[in-house]
Structures are given as C-alpha cells and as structure tokens.
C-alpha cells in the first residue's frame, strides 16, 4: 500500500533525529535539560543557591557562574572566587551566601559534568537571585514660601528600594492619603501620587501652610525625609493695583510736564540762549578793538 506524503515526511524527520542523537553519542557528549529556580532574599541576610541536578558522583566536576553583561566565575577548580571567598561557603554542590548584598542579584548557573558510558555528560541548572532592599532616606523638595492661588508641587524620590517604594506625604504629622475629603484639610485642593511621590496643590491656600515630610515604604522597610516648613502668603491684589496706579500717575504727570514745557517754548529759549553765547560777544568786541588800534592808523 502506498504511503501518504505526510507519512513520508514524518519518517524523514524521525530519521534525521536518530542520526543527530547518534552523532552526539559518537562524539562522547550529551546534555540534559536545564532547570530554573527563583530565590528571593532580603539584603544582608543569607541565601542558598541550590544546584538541583541528578545524582552526582565523586568524579563529577562542578562550576558556578554568574551571568550578566559578561560571565564571571563564582566557583571554579574546587574553590570560591572573588569576594565570595570571605562571605560564602560550599555545602555539597550548593552555595551558601552568608551576607547577601544588592550587587549579588542576578542569574547564576551551575554546571556539572561527569563521565558516563555514553561519554561526557553535562548537567546545567539556573538560579535567579532577587535581593530585596529597604528604601533609603528619600530626597524631598518642599518650597519654603509660595503665594496663595498658585499651583505648587512637592516631590519625593528614592532610588535604592527594591521593590519600588510607595510614597506618603505628611503635614504636621498627619498623613495625606488620596484626595482630601473633609477633616482638617477640607479647604485644601491637592492630589497625591503614591507611585511618583508628587503632591500637587492645584490652588494653594493659606491653610496649607505647615511642616511637610515624605515617607518611602516597601515590603522591606520605610524611611522618611526631614520635615520642611512651607509658608503660604496671601497675595495682596489691592496693594498691587494701588502700586500700578501710582506708577501710571507719575508717568502721566512727567509726560504732561514735558508737553507743557515744549508749548511754552522753554526748550526753544534755551536754544536761542545757546546761540547768543559769550563766545560770539567776545568775537565782536575783538573786531571793534582791532579797528581802533592806533598802531594800524596810516
């Protein structure tokens, strides 16, 4: 009975698979499927990176590597490498880190190779280490003095916490959560973003004066910045209007005075006076004296 094209294709694929397996065995190498673990630990505590591979033998060779932008050796030739020498130890094929730091976070890979009847066998296991870090003291931006009716932003930020912290603003020791709904801040109009750490007053009022500080918090811990006082001053609109009116009046008086002086001819008289200056008189007198000098009479 003739076989269908699909059946022939499956036979060809099976044939190539068998050939590939025979090739690996002939070259004395086989690899097992790798595993992946996730380990989460708080900074400065201990963590165990386990190499979960099949049964190991005394002839097995172990290597631990950290994979990042490059590959760095952690355990090689039966010895811990780098700074792991002083703060880690080997327990069988596992690594016990006694004092985890945030720089330890990343992907680790253990490789176990051992001779078998079919050749050299390589087993690989992967461990993803995540280090949780408490927030540091956040950087807070609070203006010292603002005017009523203006839009004002207070900012809070932390760059060290993992996971990323949430931010809560406080005024005079009282938490400002979400939009105000009554209470001591019922005359305020503000919005607090707990993700970005921005507290925004859409139209600040005199009642918003006080001491403000921000707290950054995550699952590991919380820290807050020192309190800073913000003074809200009332904008004196009537005083500004009066000042503008006075300045405009002074400018108008100066302008009218200049026009009046021009009409009365004060500027033209001054010009005529400059034309009849003492210099011309001196010249005339000199000419008359020259005419009557006796030394020139014939």
Swiss-Prot record:
SMART domains: IG (SM00409), IGc2 (SM00408), IGv (SM00406). The expression in Sertoli cells is regulated by TGFB3 through ubiquitin-mediated proteasomal degradation. Residues 1-28 form the signal peptide. InterPro entries: Ig-like_dom, Ig-like_dom_sf, Ig-like_fold, Ig_sub, Ig_sub2, Ig_V-set, JAM2. Residues 29-236 are extracellular. Glycans are attached at residue 99. Disruption phenotype: Mice lacking Jam2 do not display overt morphological, vascular or immunologic phenotype. However, aberrant myelination of dorsal horn interneuron cell bodies is observed. They develop age-dependent significant walking and gait abnormalities compared to controls. Neuropathologic brain analysis show age-dependent progressive prominent vacuolization in the midbrain, thalamus, and cerebral and cerebellar cortices. These changes are associated with reactive astrogliosis, microglial activation, and a reduced neuronal density. Similar findings are observed in spinal cord sections. The chain crosses the membrane at residues 237-257. Expressed by bone marrow stromal cells (at protein level). Expressed in skin (at protein level). Expressed in testis by Sertoli cells (at protein level). Expressed by dorsal root ganglion and spinal cord neurons. Its main location: membrane. Residues 135-238 form the Ig-like C2-type domain. GO terms for cellular component: bicellular tight junction; cell surface; plasma membrane; protein complex involved in cell adhesion; somatodendritic compartment; tight junction. It is found in: Cell membrane; Cell junction; Cell junction, Tight junction. Junctional adhesion protein that mediates heterotypic cell-cell interactions with its cognate receptor JAM3 to regulate different cellular processes. Plays a role in homing and mobilization of hematopoietic stem and progenitor cells within the bone marrow. At the surface of bone marrow stromal cells, it contributes to the retention of the hematopoietic stem and progenitor cells expressing JAM3. Plays a central role in leukocytes extravasation by facilitating not only transmigration but also tethering and rolling of leukocytes along the endothelium. The Ig-like V-type domain is necessary and sufficient to mediate interaction with JAM3 and integrin alpha-4/beta-1. Belongs to the immunoglobulin superfamily. This is Junctional adhesion molecule B. It comes from Mus musculus. The gene is Jam2.
